[in-house]
Amino acid sequence: MGINDVDINKVTPMMRQYIEIKQKNKDIIIFFRLGDFYEMFFEDAVNVSRELELTLTGKSCGLEERVPMCGIPHHAANIYIDKLIEKGYKVGICEQLEDPALAKGIVERDLIQIVSPGTIISQESLVDWDNNYIGNIIDLDYAYGVSYTDISTGEIKAFITDKNNNKVVSQILSIGIKEIVADSKVATEIIGLLKNQYKIVVTITDQINDYDYYDYIFKDLKDMRYKRIVNHLLTYITNTQKRFLNHFQTLKTIELDEHMKMDVHTKRNLELTETLRLKQRNYSLIWLLDKTKTAPGARLLKTFIENPEIKMEVINKRLDIVSTLMKEFILKNDLIDSLNEVYDLERLAGRVAFGSANARDLLQIKNSLKILPNIQKILEKINFYYKIETLPELYELLENSIYEEPPVSIKEGFLIKSGYNAELDELKDLRKGGKDFVARFENEERERTGLKTLKVGYNRVFGYFIEVSKGSVNLVKEEFGYERRQTLANAERYISPILKEKEALILNAEEKIIDLEYNLFVEIRENVKTYISRIQKIAKVLSEIDVLQSFATVAETNNFVRPELTLERDIEVIDGRHPVVEKVINREYVANDVKMNTDTDILLITGPNMAGKSTYMRELAIIVIMAQIGSFVPATKAKLPIFDAIFTRIGASDDLVSGESTFMVEMLEANNAIMNATKNSLILFDELGRGTATFDGMSLAQAIIEYIHNNIGAKTLFSTHYHELTDLENKLKHLKNVHVSALEENGKITFLHKIKDGSVDKSYGIHVASLANLPKELIARANEILNIYEKKEKRIDTKVQECLPLNFEVKDNKAIEHLKQIDPNSLTPIAALNILYELKEEVKR
């Protein structure tokens, strides 16, 4: 039975309430609170029971047949919500808004929050070391506006980007946004890519409210376009969270060229935050560098790695602090010990703003504040460029009010210390007196009645009672004044007038204590809410010093050196190492130099398979990134320019989802570098052209090398198996040949992993195949065929074109006119292919 098949006038009041809420939120799974359970009905029940492997049952609701139903305990809701979110669902939490015992008629219920991939705030559901971003895109007619926030921390950023579909998708992927809100004008190709290829939850809405409540976010904002962009996102968040949130920080607008540019492919190829194959954090660069002690520090480290600095003064300020911490190791160790005592202040502030912080959260804030004076002294001694507040008045409030070991729930009492509130103290004295009476009454009754097994107990059904064992029941006399209440297998339970009188006083005090403690706690939490922006500033400073102590710790452990950043374009890395590879291999790492002066823009790298060409290329990129985030680097000396971007084409894997072949992916990534690189960029091309036929691939590789050499001038590492290309050293004055050396003895090959000047003319592919234990007869046959090919081989002319402008002459005017009328930004891949075939036919005619 589906919800649309039901006559709402025939169902019970409770089910009518559910249906009315569900019909307003059709695309959301409703968790409907009934007592100690969340229950789901109709299609929601069917879907949830299937996805979570729950028992599907039925519920009577006034109809002839029971409606589908499943349920979960309310205290375990986060576990089930997380599983549904991972599967791409949104979950609406429908709570009871009044005490069922006090309700007149049907209990009032309503949605209090909609949970989606980008709006998770529960501590158990979030990863400490990663942000959980929700973002939006709006069409500004001439450009796209993008903003994003982590509602668990309150940071909020925005940028305006070209109206290029692939570019904006790449930027969203690079940031790691988990959920997108888009207006209806955003290109369907963008929506399709995000939803279908990258499995990002997308909501289409044009609603934009200009809330006065959020005006503080736009303080000192000069470009008011950003207000519209961000308000689109804030409207969605406010609507789904059913409240205003005061922990959003002042908007940070981003210029896309204010940090080193790296697209999502470059970040993946270099394994900055996860490995290529297993998508794991272990054995990535962040795994090596992360010795942070706080969750905000770990998240900031990830931000640093993905957005290296290009301002020399910022980089050198960080390097100065790292140097100081390495010299002042006692201070550094004291700092590390202190940071270990600091909790996740960013997300604690977020939970306070959300109204979901419990007493344990406030206790974590208090314990973090306690350590701040010591951290402030350390920061002063190392001349750190930021200061922190210590908020002694907030610490005093929490120290005087919150129990040291409070329960998780804020509705069970035992939250507030004695001495904080006079009325509460009076009630606690009354409760204590009542409990003392119970103990005294039990002893007196034993003495009075002679019943040695008599006990006084309590449960929620009968309240306080007198319990007498079965063996002594016959000794209970009428003059005792006991009234029988319950018969058990081994005992009888009674009440007495005196006990019931005291019970009323005790339970009344207990109930009042719980209510008063809850109200006092909420009052304290509201007070803490006024400190949110100051707590966030403290967290920001602590996160940065935490990252820098992590850099110092890693540098000491791994023998890293301070890089020298210059305004020149020379690269001089002596004994460079790939820090992650060095950490995980079971042998001594072979260090290599990278020297590229003003006369050398391109290193053409040849050498055997598996000899280390790719590692050498990645090594330089990793050293550059580490230097520009303010870290020491794995080398004995490193003199580097400031790079504005890194472009890579490393590895070859078909993009099966989008239907793009290895070669197409190669060409797209090469084109990205060619169109966007400057002379201050770093380009890494590994085996470019291998995805197509040999002559095609070699021709393209040479043309690309020439174009970079003549038109861009970027520092480039280009590895190849096309040994014919090594002739280019004699024809391109800024290109230099280097090779990875190997030792060949008695038909066996030993990889030396050492980079040397000059070229090699062998790839040793068959040797590598033998190392992979291919059958010996197969290896022998391959050697025979190789000898045949080597005898037939003719040297290919690598005549250089002086300059390769990216234009061409087409005589067919119809094709040109057709091209002029095409808007590439509005084309889907299929439409583009169709037009390509049409153009081909026109040229043929």
Question: What residues fall within each predicted segment?
Answer:
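Charged catalytic and DNA/RNA-contacting regions of genome-maintenance
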Residues: 1-324, 333, 337-340, 344-353, ...
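ATPase nucleotide-binding head domains, primarily ABC-like/P-loop NTPase cores
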Residues: 8, 42-45, 223, 293, ...
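Short flexible coil/turn linkers enriched for glycine and charged/polar residues
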Residues: 25-26, 85-87, 129, 140-142, ...
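Beta-sheet entry/capping signal
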Residues: 28-31, 37, 88-92, 179, ...
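Amphipathic heptad-repeat alpha-helical coiled-coil/stalk segments that mediate oligomerization
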Residues: 207-213, 261, 276, 367-436, ...
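Charged, surface-exposed helical/loop "interaction arms" that form contiguous linear patches used
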Residues: 344, 354, 358, 368-371, ...
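Short, small/acidic-rich helices and loops at N termini and domain boundaries
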Residues: 358, 838-842
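Extended, charged coiled-coil "arm/hinge" scaffolds of SMC/Rad50-like chromosome-maintenance ATPases
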Residues: 488, 492-526
